Curated annotation (Swiss-Prot):
Residues 352-430 form the PAN domain. The chain crosses the membrane at residues 465-485. It comes from Oryza sativa subsp. japonica. One of its GO terms (cellular component) is membrane. This is G-type lectin S-receptor-like serine/threonine-protein kinase LECRK3.
Length: 811
């Protein structure tokens, strides 16, 4: 009876051993694969990799012959078969339909389509068997065990640990993530010993000027991705040039790969094999190093479009190591799925037959923040001011963009197509792009002159009639003209009182009080209350039903009545992605109202201090946005604006959680005792710079101090002052953060936040920047330009001194 009980166990053991043995067996002559059914791939012994047919983008009618990571849900492809295109040097991916067969027979491996036509073979004979190795390498071997062909020797866009690229080989990026055709970039191990990265003209394959090189001509040997995860280029004398510098994680715990991605960046990725063993790592591919660090800056060719397509610009998301291509205002992608094709205007091109006045009425020059197209110049002027630079472009039908450099008083005009576009925090020039003017907007170049010409036309017409008519008619005409002149002068005076001239963009719209009362439903829904008044939600009665936020200024100081229009003009001239846009205003009787775009996601105060902490990447995005908005206010707009009351309540979030600063430009309008109850300073407790309490001048550094507090709050997801914390040392965040930084325990600030812990180096950088912003002495604080550079990782950050170290010396 016992032997009967033991029999099933023995059978299971034999079955297990048989399957294990089969996993190690060679792929023998006569074996075959088909795209559909269970026999569609050959698996490596560990099942980490597979070779066979993979549906292209989930499309069951088209299959790729490939090698992929078999244990990862998205089956990440690391190699795919390619064949020459009509006898040309360039290659195309091998994609077949169901019914095709891959067969190892007669000493060769051959892929045939449903009609029996051969579509691919690796051009080797006398093959005895094949192997799919645990390294991800698919090999064909002779009967003697010698390698006849291997996928590692014919790379596509990816290399794996233990893979070596010898002289004359190259990686080709894909065209798109799901289009395996040769893309726009190559990484070549040249026969002259140099490792070079090139932009590639699609579809011709012409190589533009390189954007990175190892500079090892006559010395380089091979590109190595070794078994420990290091990637380096070997030199003939035995030395090595590191290609990536990432700290390598355990090969046992992570899958590794390095890919020349579709954006031209060579990235080294890791993926946790066991998410339970590595709980802090996301279950996805994470880039641990990139080359080059900034593709937008690296590519700049006289021929070709640059990193992105023509008329677009390139931007880097440092938090995710990703590259994006964007279209400027009033432009859209030619093909949304193939953004490398560039952008086109979504308006009619300027007609060269237009006279200057008509051109200025139909077109405007809109500023673009931190974007530049360094090439495409066709005209230069010097010396010149910005207004004239604008005029010269808007009246020139060939001009698409004008660039003005204030320091040198120089203007450049650029024409289509715009190339090498890039977004960069260090763009020192004002970039203006031509866009259509809305039909109801007055000219940016003083509407007065065109109105004067219009008046002159009617005066001339009137004079002609006057001399050619009877006395009675002349008398009536004179009466009408005198009355018209009186009305015109009266109207012009009213216009001058209610709307100052605007020379830098579309002016804010003038609303009547009744319009805003109707839009807000009688000022019913309160969005917030601040020092300058109450903010109400409203909706315009336009074709879009535009949601708005209406600020009713209730405590305007008497001497600021005349300043109101000047300040509105200043605010109305600010155009930036990270500033809440002023749509219009009301200056009727004693009523002073400002109309802003509505921010659907509310304030940073609500967003940050809720029960659920926002993701680290989103907090980073907000921090960078606020920094760039302040940089614009301090250094880039026509008239410097010091906010004086930076705090989370004055930072709003739009539909995409883009941070936008509100309430800027209002400091001059408010009595000093209205910006903070019971104090003689402007600002809010906890965010106020020390110099407010001293008899020294107030500069933009007060905003830098406030930003330092906000930055720490963003890092830690808590308020600066929390009286209910268990540890008394943590009550004031600025003090606690300084203590943690000095002790090397930054991790305590983000305890329980796995995403932040994973990015602890960036957390440390942000805390260091915040501590520099919080220096007691204003001159020790960085400018917002330096702050943005430090946050972006563009400059080294020296160790910040203790923020309170100056207190004793100032006492």
């Amino acid at each position: 009876m016992a032997h009967l009980l033991f029999l099933p166990i023995l059978q299971l053991l034999l079955l297990y051993c048989t399957k294990s043995a089969q996993a190690q067996l060679n792929i023998s002559i006569g074996s075959s694969l088909t795209p559909q059914g269970v026999n569609n791939s050959w698996i490596s012994p560990s099942a980490d990799f597979a070779f066979g047919f993979l549906a292209v983008d989930g499309n069951s009618s088209s299959y790729l012959l490939a090698v992929w990571f078999n244990k990862i849900a998205d089956k990440t492809v690391v190699w795919y078969a390619r064949t020459s295109s009509n006898g040309k040097d360039d290659t195309i991916p091998v994609q077949v339909q169901s019914g095709s067969v891959l067969k190892l027979a007669d000493g060769a491996l051959s892929l045939r389509d449903p009609s029996g036509n051969e579509v691919w073979n690796p051009q080797v004979t006398d093959v005895g068997y094949a192997r799919m190795l645990d390294t991800g390498n698919f090999r064909l071997l002779g009967t003697d065990g010698a390698t006849k062909w291997e996928s590692f020797g014919d790379p596509s866009d990816t290399i794996l640990p233990t893979q070596v690229l010898s002289l004359g080989t190259a990686l080709h990026s894909r065209l798109l993530a799901t289009d395996y055709s040769n893309g726009r970039f190559q990484l070549k191990v040249q026969r002259d010993g140099n490792l070079v990265m090139y932009p590639d003209a699609v579809p011709s394959g012409y190589l533009y000027d390189p954007y990175w090189a190892s500079n090892t001509v006559d010395n380089g040997s091979q590109l190595v991705f070794n078994e420990t995860g290091r990637i380096y280029f070997t030199i003939i004398n035995g030395s090595q040039v590191n290609i990536t510098s990432a700290g390598v994680d355990s090969m046992g715990d992570f899958f590794h790969r390095a890919t020349l991605d579709t954006d031209g960046v060579f990235r080294q990725y890791v993926y946790p094999k066991n998410i339970h063993a590595r709980p802090l790592w996301p279950e996805q591919w994470t880039a641990v190093d990139v080359l080059p660090e900034n593709i937008c800056q690296s590519i700049q060719t006289m021929v070709g479009s640059g990193a992105c397509g023509f008329n677009s610009y390139c931007t880097i998301d440092g938090t995710k190591n990703t590259t994006s291509c964007l279209c400027p205002q009033n432009y859209k992608f030619i093909d949304d799925k193939r953004k490398y094709k560039g952008c086109r205007p979504d308006f009619e091109p300027q007609n060269c037959d237009l006279d200057e006045t008509t051109a200025m009425l139909q077109y405007d020059m809109a500023p673009i923040d931190r974007v530049d197209w360094p090439l495409s110049d066709y005209e230069q002027y010097n010396p010149i001011d910005q207004t004239e630079c604008r005029r010269l472009c808007v009246t020139d039908c060939f001009c698409a963009v004008a660039v003005f450099d204030k320091a040198s008083s120089t203007c450049w005009k650029k024409r289509f197509p715009l190339s090498n576009g890039k977004m960069d925090v260090n763009v020192p020039r004002t970039v203006l792009i031509k866009v259509p003017r809305s039909t109801n907007s007055p000219s940016v170049f003083s509407s007065g002159s065109s109105k004067w010409k219009e008046d002159q036309k009617y005066w001339i017409l009137g004079s002609s009639l006057l001399f050619g008519s009877s006395v009675l008619v002349n008398f009536l005409l004179i009466s009408v003209m005198l009355f018209g002149t009186y009305c015109s002068i009266t109207s012009r005076k009213k216009t001058q009182l209610s709307q100052p001239s605007n020379n830098s963009g579309l002016p804010p719209k003038i609303f009547t009080y009744s319009e805003l009362e109707k839009a807000t439903g009688g000022f019913q829904e309160v969005l917030g209350t601040g020092a300058s008044g109450v903010v109400y939600k409203g909706q315009l009665q336009d074709e879009f039903g535009t949601n708005i936020a209406v600020k009713k200024i209730e405590k305007l100081q008497q001497e600021a009545q005349k300043e109101f229009l000047v300040e509105v003009q200043t605010i109305g001239q600010t155009f930036h992605r990270n500033l809440v846009r002023l749509l219009g205003f009301c200056n009727e009787g004693t009523e002073r109202l400002l109309v802003y775009e509505f921010m659907s996601n509310g304030s940073l105060n609500t967003f940050l201090f809720s029960d659920t902490h926002p993701h680290w990447s989103l907090r980073v995005q907000v921090a960078l946005g606020v920094a760039r908005g302040l940089l614009y206010l301090h250094e880039e707009c026509n008239k410097q604006i010091i906010h004086c009351d930076m705090k989370p309540q004055n930072i709003l979030l739009d539909d995409n959680f883009v941070a936008k600063i509100s309430d800027f430009g209002l400091a001059k309008l408010l009595p000093v005792n209205q910006t903070q109850t019971n104090t003689g300073i402007r600002g809010t407790r906890g965010y106020v710079a020390p110099e407010w309490f001293k008899n020294i001048g107030i500069t933009s550094k007060v905003d830098v101090y406030s930003f330092g507090v906000i930055l720490l709050e963003l890092v830690c997801c808590r308020k600066n002052v929390e009286l209910e914390v268990l540890d008394e040392e943590q009550t004031i965040l600025t003090y606690w953060a300084n203590d943690c930084y000095k002790c090397g325990r930054i991790d305590l600030l983000v305890a329980g936040d796995d995403e932040a812990i994973f990015n602890i180096k960036k957390v440390e950088r942000f805390v260091a920047v915040a501590l520099w912003c919080l220096q007691e002495e204003p001159s020790m604080r960085p400018t917002m330009l330096k702050v943005t550079q430090m946050l972006d990782g563009a400059v080294q950050i020296p160790t910040p001194p203790d923020p309170s170290s100056y207190i004793s010396s100032l006492a």
